[in-house]
């Protein structure tokens, strides 16, 4: 809530209330079957009002409020849970719901080895462990991401190396990834931020040239497509999150998957305390317990069939917003490759500071007052700027591999100027499949209204 600290009471109520009203989430079970499967013509935009900004007492551009989603579960989940309660086990190994999740997941993301787990963070840790990351090994990834992306690297005593990002894609810049490769580099974690596919051809080429493992962090990218191919199928290992805010959910959970014979057979062991249950072997790897239970799997199995409609609708609405704001001077829309499908876990545009007579904070507050569900930036600062990185205090205030001379990484000296600029100029807008074209058009009008008012 740090972005609200300097607000008046009225501004806080307007901004924070609207942001919570437009909460992340998946399509409600009640409306799942009626969700549109085809693109309908968008209503025409109305003229931009010349009246005073709402924050200065003028009328709101978004006058009808932010569309909500309602409950995101219902009869399909209830049926799966009732059937699950007739089983003799709630354990994942051999559990019918877990097997059903694997089958339905492969219809979305056709990978040979699929393992359910307790979270997206767990999925990423399993992937890093299966990739063989160990003390001092470097893994290149994004500085703008959830800490879950790097927790597994650190627990394996690896070293996160943060590369620069694309100006408006907010994804890894392949050229900078190439520059940061050293003899210690062992893997790349490509974060598809907000559901926008990374440049996977370029990253895969780099990985192949340097014999690196390419891990896809698909936590925010359920249903996204890269050049027509499902996200998760291009790299060596794919990781998904089922946390409550994601496109589909079981409250918390994850899936890690691969078709690569070097890694796929090990995913189950690294998520199940090292047990190789299929072959009944002893503990020949050290691992933690990241298992998903059958009740969680029952909910996931019920939600997976709705994913395509959710993803398609988010893509449609996000692309509509881009179309309507791309002409506004000083506004940088969320950049998506024309052959890709971004599934907009959120939408983020940037403002050009020199184009406006206001700060990003003032622009954001004015936009929120117009009735738009929005927030400033994404995370407060790049991961390397967080205190735990600045102090190298990952394990009880210490970083063993640095103490033993296995890395010279010093995060106090690390800088990614473009990533820092993204967070300093970005404004995040809520997008979900329960929204209407009319609302998105009103959001675009509000952005243009604020931009015109503050134009330099």
For every predicted segment, state its role.
Residues 2-20:
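N-terminal secretory signal peptides and thylakoid transit peptides that target proteins
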Residues 54, 129-218, 225:
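PLP-dependent aminotransferase-like
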Residues 276-279, 323-325, 338, 364-426:
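Conserved PLP cofactor-binding pocket of PLP-dependent enzymes
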Residues 355-362, 436-441:
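Short, conserved charged micro-motifs
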């Amino acid at each position: 809530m740090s972005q609200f600290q300097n607000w008046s009471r009225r501004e806080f109520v307007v901004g924070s209330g609207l942001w919570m009203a437009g909460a992340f989430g998946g399509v409600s079970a009640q409306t799942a079957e009626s969700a549109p499967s085809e693109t309908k013509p968008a209503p025409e935009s109305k003229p931009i009002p010349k009246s005073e900004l709402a924050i200065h007492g003028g009328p709101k551009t978004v006058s009808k409020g932010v569309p909500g989603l309602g409950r995101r579960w219902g009869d399909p989940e209830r049926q799966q849970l009732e059937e699950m309660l007739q089983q003799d086990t709630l354990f994942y190994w051999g559990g019918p719901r877990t097997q059903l999740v694997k089958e339905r997941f492969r219809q979305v993301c056709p990978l040979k080895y699929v393992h359910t787990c307790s979270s997206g963070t767990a999925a990423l840790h399993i992937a890093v462990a299966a990739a063989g990351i160990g003390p001092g090994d470097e893994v290149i990834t994004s500085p703008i991401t959830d800490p879950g992306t790097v927790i597994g690297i650190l627990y394996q005593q690896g070293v996160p190396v943060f590369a620069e990002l694309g100006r408006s894609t907010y994804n890894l810049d392949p050229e900078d990834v190439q520059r940061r490769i050293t003899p210690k580099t062992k893997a790349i974690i490509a974060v598809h931020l907000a559901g926008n596919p990374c440049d996977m051809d370029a990253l895969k080429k780099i990985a192949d040239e340097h014999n690196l493992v390419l891990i896809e962090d698909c936590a925010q990218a359920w249903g996204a497509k890269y050049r027509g191919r499902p996200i998760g199928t291009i790299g060596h290992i794919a990781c998904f999150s089922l946390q409550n805010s994601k496109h589909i959910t079981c409250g918390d959970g994850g899936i890690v998957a691969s078709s690569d014979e070097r890694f796929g057979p090990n995913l189950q062991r690294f998520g199940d305390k090292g047990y190789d249950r299929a072959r009944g072997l002893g503990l020949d790897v050290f691992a933690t317990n990241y298992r998903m239970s059958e009740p969680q799997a029952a909910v996931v199995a019920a939600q997976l069939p709705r994913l395509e409609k959710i993803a398609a609708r988010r893509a449609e609405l996000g692309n509509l917003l881009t179309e309507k704001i791309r002409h506004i001077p000083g506004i940088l829309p969320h950049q998506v490759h024309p052959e890709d499908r971004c599934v907009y876990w959120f939408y983020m545009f940037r403002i050009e500071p020199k184009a406006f007579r206001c700060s990003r904070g003032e622009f954001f507050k004015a936009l929120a007052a117009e009735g738009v569900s929005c927030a400033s930036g994404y995370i407060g600062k790049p991961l390397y700027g967080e205190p735990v990185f600045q102090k190298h205090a990952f394990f009880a205030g210490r970083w063993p591999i640095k103490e033993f001379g296995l890395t010279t990484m010093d995060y106090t000296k690390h800088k990614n100027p473009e990533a820092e600029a993204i967070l300093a100029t970005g404004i995040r807008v809520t997008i979900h499949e329960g929204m209407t074209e009319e609302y998105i058009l009103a959001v675009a009008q509000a952005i243009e209204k604020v931009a015109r008012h503050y134009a330099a």
